[in-house]
Structures are given as structure tokens and as C-alpha cells.
Amino acid sequence: MDRANALAREYLAAWNERNPAARRALVARLFTVDAAYLDPMMAGRGHDGIDALIGAAQQHFPGHRFELAGAPDAHHDVLRFGWTLHGPDGAAVVRGLDVATVGGDGRLASVTGFLDRAA
């Protein structure tokens, strides 16, 4: 379970990283080369696509931060974890759940995000 917790925290760190070069390095370290991301509002594939959609989300939600909500859960090569998006004032704005598959190299091969109603 320690690896599940580490992956979830690294994943959210990538979403919170505002420096483009540092974010890109996190994406490359965290995701497989052909990884896929999908949620109700956006989709991306590969390091370029995932980095671009994270950057777009940051522009759409300036000053917001993601935090892990609860303990991640994992079995076999599947990981799930909840998160909360907090506004600049610290108030919870949105909650969601992501389900990820982990590739043979230990990096994320796919992430499917589910958005709950506004927090």
C-alpha cells in the first residue's frame, strides 16, 4: 500500500506543479510513454498530451490545489484514490475519484477520473 500512496501523492504533485519544466519532469517520471488520461472534461495521451491538459486545468483554475482525500486503495495493477480541489481561499471546490492502471515498470499507464458534485 505504500507504493499506492506514493503514486497518488506524486500524481497530485504533478497536477499542483506550476513550473512547466518541473511539471513535465514529474509527468515523465510518473506516466508511461503512451499513458492515457480521461475524465468527463478532457482527455490526453502520452507525456505531451497529459502535460498539456494539466497545464490547461491550471490555467482554468488559477491558484487551486489538489489534495489527497483519504487513503488510496490498490490491488493487482489497479489503484484508486479520492482527491479534493481547493480554491485559493482553501475552500473545497470539487471532489473526485481517479482510477489508474499501473504498468509493468511501476508507472501509471492510464488514469480515468470521475468528478463528484461541487464540494
Give residue spans per PLM region.
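A generic alpha-helix structural signal
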Residues: 8, 12, 51-54, 82
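Aromatic side chains
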Residues: 11, 31, 37, 81-83, ...
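A beta-strand edge to alpha-helix "cap/lid" segment located at domain peripheries
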Residues: 16, 58-119
